[in-house]
Curated annotation (Swiss-Prot):
Job of this protein: Binds directly to 23S rRNA. The L1 stalk is quite mobile in the ribosome, and is involved in E site tRNA release.
GO biological process: regulation of translation; translation
Disulphide linkage map: none
Pfam families assigned: Ribosomal_L1 (PF00687)
Subunit structure: Part of the 50S ribosomal subunit.
Protein name: Large ribosomal subunit protein uL1
Lineage summary: Bacteria, Bacillati, Actinomycetota, Actinomycetes, Micrococcales
Keyword Chloroplast carried by entry: no
Gene Ontology annotations for the cellular component aspect, listed alphabetically: large ribosomal subunit
Organism name: Kocuria rhizophila (strain ATCC 9341 / DSM 348 / NBRC 103217 / DC2201)
Annotated keywords: Repressor, Ribonucleoprotein, Ribosomal protein, RNA-binding, rRNA-binding, Translation regulation, tRNA-binding
Encoding gene, per UniProt annotation: rplA
Domain of life: Bacteria
MF term (GO), any: tRNA binding
Length: 236
C-alpha cells in the first residue's frame, strides 16, 4: 500500500475512532479537513448496499437533482440531428453530433461527463456500449438521458443532476459538491441523494439496506457515517 501523505495522516487523526457520524456532522468535518487544500476538492459519498447486483430485481440505479448543484460544470454530449440538435446546442450542450461524434468516441475520445441521445439515435449509439457502459456514460431512458426533450436533459445535467448505479461489489458512489460549499448546502445535497437512494430500495432486498457509508473529499480520509440514518438534519 502506498504511504499516506503527512496531510492525509493529520486529517485522519481528527476522525474519532469507532464513531459513526450523523450525515450533516460528517460533511461539516469533511469540509474542515479540506481546509488549506491547494485545490477545491470534491466531496463524495460512498455506500455499501445490502443488495445482490447480479440479480436484476436488486439493481439500484437512479438520478437526483442536487438542490445546490455539484460545483462542477458538466461537459455534455448529445447525439441528435435536425431540430433536436439545434435545441441541444441552444441549451448549452458542449458537443452535438451524429455519425461524426460516434466515430470520435470510437477513436477513444471520452472527455465528457454525460451523454444524451434522442431515441432514434440509440441504434447507432448502442455501438458505443463497450466504451460508454463501463464509464457509466451510456444514455439510458431510466436516467432521462434517452429523450426527445434534449434541452431539458442538458439543463438538468448542467444544473446539478447526478446519476448513480450500484457496482458489482454492491458499492454506490456519488458526489454532493465541493469543499468550498457551505456545510448546510453540502448537507442538503446529501439529504436529497439519500432520500432517492432509500426510495429505490428493491423489494427483493432483505435485511439492512445501507450497510456502510462514508463521506470524504478527493484523496481525503473516509469519515464513517451512521448507516441507519434515513434523513439529513440541517440547521438554517
Amino acid at each position: 500500500m502506498a504511504k499516506r501523505s503527512k496531510a492525509y495522516r493529520a486529517a485522519a487523526e481528527k476522525i474519532e475512532a469507532g464513531k459513526f457520524y450523523a450525515p450533516a456532522e460528517a460533511v461539516a468535518l469533511a469540509k474542515e479537513l479540506a481546509e488549506g487544500s491547494k485545490s477545491d476538492p470534491t466531496v463524495e459519498v460512498a455506500m455499501r448496499l445490502g443488495v445482490d447486483p447480479r440479480k436484476a430485481d436488486q439493481m439500484v440505479r437512479g438520478t437526483v437533482n442536487l438542490p445546490n448543484g455539484t460545483g462542477k460544470t458538466a461537459r455534455v454530449v448529445v447525439f441528435a440531428t435536425g431540430d433536436k440538435a439545434a435545441a441541444a446546442e441552444a441549451a448549452g450542450a458542449d458537443f452535438v453530433g451524429n455519425d461524426d461524434l460516434i466515430a470520435r468516441i470510437q477513436g477513444g475520445w471520452t472527455d465528457f461527463d454525460a451523454a444524451v441521445a434522442t431515441p432514434d439515435m440509440m441504434g447507432k449509439v448502442g455501438r458505443l456500449g463497450k466504451i460508454l457502459g463501463p464509464r457509466n456514460l451510456m444514455p439510458n431512458p431510466k436516467t432521462g438521458t434517452v429523450t426527445m426533450d434534449v434541452a431539458k436533459a442538458v439543463n438538468d445535467i448542467k444544473g446539478g443532476k447526478i446519476d448513480f448505479r450500484v457496482d458489482k461489489h454492491s458499492n454506490l458512489h456519488f458526489i454532493i459538491g465541493k469543499a468550498s460549499f457551505d456545510a448546510q448546502k453540502l448537507a442538503e445535497n446529501y439529504g436529497a441523494a439519500l432520500e432517492e437512494v432509500l426510495r429505490l430500495k428493491p423489494s427483493a432486498s432483505k435485511g439492512r439496506y445501507i450497510t456502510k457509508a462514508t463521506v470524504a473529499t478527493t484523496f481525503g480520509p473516509g469519515i464513517p457515517v451512521d448507516p441507519n440514518a434515513t434523513e439529513v438534519t440541517t440547521q438554517a
